[in-house]
Structure formats: C-alpha cells, structure tokens
Amino acid sequence: MGAQVRLPPGEPCQEGYVLSLVCPNSSQAWCEITNVSQLLASPVLYTDLNSSINKLSISANVENKYSLYVGLVLAVSSSIFIGSSFILKKKGLLQLASKGITRAGQGGHSYLKEWLWWVGLLSMGVGEAANFAAYAFAPATLVTPLGALSVLISAILSSYFLNEHLNIHGKIGCILSILGSTVMVIHAPQEEEVTSLHEMEMKLRDPGFISFAVIVTVISLVLILIVAPKKGQTNILVYISICSLIGAFSVSSVKGLGIAIKELIEWKPVYKHPLVFVLLAVLVLSVTTQINYLNKALDTFNTSIVTPIYYVFFTSMVVTCSAILFQEWYGMTAGDIIGTLSGFFTIIIGIFLLHAFKNTDITWSELTSTAKKEAVSLNVSENNYVLLENLECSAPGYNDDVTLFSRTDD
C-alpha cells in the first residue's frame, strides 16, 4: 500500500473525478477516484492532515495572488496597446481618405495597403494577446473593466495626433473611468470558477448559456444582414452593437483557450479535446467580424465617440456573458456585487461626460472666471434684495399709520 495522496483545496473528492499525479521518474499518471471513505479519528493523523491542508491552503492563496497580479499587469498592458491601435488605424484611414480612395465605411478595403493601418493592427494584436493571457490568470469580471484605460489613452492620443479636442468634461470623464475601473478591480472576484476544459465544456452545455448564445447570434445576424446596410452609416450604435455582441463570444473563447494552454503546459493531452478546435474557430470568426465592423465605425464616426461607446457596450456584454457562463458572481458577497456595479456605473458616467460634451469648448480658466462672475452678480442681487426688502417693510408701516389716522377722523 503506497503513501496517502491529499488533494489540494478546491479539488472535488468524489467518485469518478480524474486527477493528474507526477511520478518520481518525471512521468505523469492519471488516476480516477473509485471509492471515498471517511478517515479514522486519529489525533496524530488529524494533526498531520490539518498541517498539510494549511500548507496547501497558504500555497494556493499565494498562487492565486500571483496569478491575480500577473493578470492585472497583462490587462493594463493590453489597454495601452489597444488604445494606441485606435489612433494608428484611424491615422491610416485618414491618409487614405485624403488620397480620394474608397473608404472602409463605404465598403472599400484599400486600408490593407496602408502600412500605418498595419502598425495599428499589430498594436491591437499585441494588446489582444496580452488580454488573451490575462484571461488565463484572472477572472473576466476583473480583466474586462480595465479596458477603460484604453478609452483614456485613446482620448489623450487623439487630442495630440488627430487634432480631436478634449475639453474639461472629457478629462473629468477619463478620471471617472479610471476611478470606476479601480473600484471594480477591488470588488471583483479573485478566484476562477472554471479551471479545466472539462468544467468549461459543462458550462457551455448549460441551458442558460445556450439560450444566451442563440439570442445573441440571432440579434447579430439581424444587425449584419438587415440593419447595417440601411442604418450603419447614420447610426453609430449599429456597428458597435455588432462588435460588442460578437465580442462576448470572443472573450469566452479566449478564456477557454487560456485554460487549454495552462493544461498543455501541465502536459495534459488537450489537443485531443474537440472543444479546443471549436473555441479556436469561434475566436477567429468573432475577431474577424469585430475588426471589420470596428473599421467601419472608426472610418465613419469620430474616434472619441467610437472608443467610449464601444467600451460600454463591449464591457456590458462580457460581464453578462461571464455571469451566465462562468458564474463568477455567485461567489461574491452582496457588498462586492454592489461595489462592482457602482464602479461600472461610474465608468458609464465618465464615458457619458466624455461623449456628450465633446463639442463644448470649455476650459478650466473659463469655469473659474464664470464662477467669479456669478459670485459678484449674486452679491449685487443680494444687496438689491435687501434694499427692496427694507422699502417693502417700511411701506406697510406708513399705510398702517394712514389707516389709523383715517379711522380716528371717523
């Protein structure tokens, strides 16, 4: 009889569960639990078991924190590259428009010959790769909100390189977006609910997610085939809605492929699992569709409008998909849920300020001078009000005297 094998915290100890063991000769064995029995109440064994569990728990906590920090760094790097890619691609599209070539918003694909557009695409590819890796280390509810940083970077760079003005409202909106993202990071779940391809497959087979996927697919097809040809050039929400709806599938695919890569590093035969190829096909199709319609949105509308609205729609879809598929919200307390929602609504308010007042040319000096003028006018009006009040107070006294005098005569 060999030594006892203790499962780390979080691993289910139930019949039929398959686990991986590393043998002394550097080989790997797969074991299936066939019988589960209770341990005898031995004080020595109980103490030894508690000690081992505590060590494993501490090790698991350290590993979770390490993974969380790695995911945060990758997510921030992703936002920097993606935010820059919007500017580079827009710059390339503007250069093509100045040459009189058919624009992407009109169905043209001449941007494929513009090197600056390719630099932007490469920057977006690096950002998406970092984002891809971030989903393997941290929950989707934590990684996705950090995309608000791309809004900030895109807004700042567009004011410098595209001559798109960023007023005081836009700056306040950027700050609110960062604060909202920080709140969401603090209250986001810090443990992954799906850690293997088998669990991922079970989640994908859930009736709730299947219904969600069918509804999103039908809406996307209606927008692509019917609405986009008629309203795409005049309504910014059409192209962005397509990108956001399809983006929900891309994030789910990225999460699953990230889990597959982690299992591949652990020498598990994931290449034999058909789910890997299904996720890869969905990822390629969804990313291709996103790039196509995002190009049309950027070429047709202002970058400072496209970026924030795309962020709000995309984040909403990802959070919804994450809640349905990965069920990360089930492990959160009521306070964390309220904090996450508050942070997200703070981001939306910041995005609204960035978008709604973008054509309002107001500076900080104008705001301060206006406040001073209002204070002076308020003091003048208060003095006039006091003077009128004194006159009004004296008038009734005079009338009373006259009335009293007339009554005396009577």
Swiss-Prot record:
Keyword Transport in record: yes
Keywords from the UniProt entry: Glycoprotein, Golgi apparatus, Ion transport, Magnesium, Membrane, Transmembrane, Transmembrane helix, Transport
Cytoplasmic side: 89-114, 158-165, 229-233, 295-304, 358-410
Compartment annotation: Golgi apparatus membrane
Membrane-crossing segments per the record: 68-88, 115-135, 137-157, 166-186, 208-228, 234-254, 274-294, 305-325, 337-357
Membrane-protein topology: Multi-pass membrane protein
Domain of life: Eukaryota
Signal peptide: none
Gene Ontology CC terms: Golgi apparatus; Golgi membrane
Annotated family: Belongs to the NIPA family.
Functional summary from the UniProt entry: Acts as a Mg(2+) transporter. Can also transport other divalent cations such as Fe(2+), Sr(2+), Ba(2+), Mn(2+), Cu(2+) and Co(2+) but to a much less extent than Mg(2+).
The protein, known as: Magnesium transporter NIPA3
Organism: Pongo abelii (Sumatran orangutan)
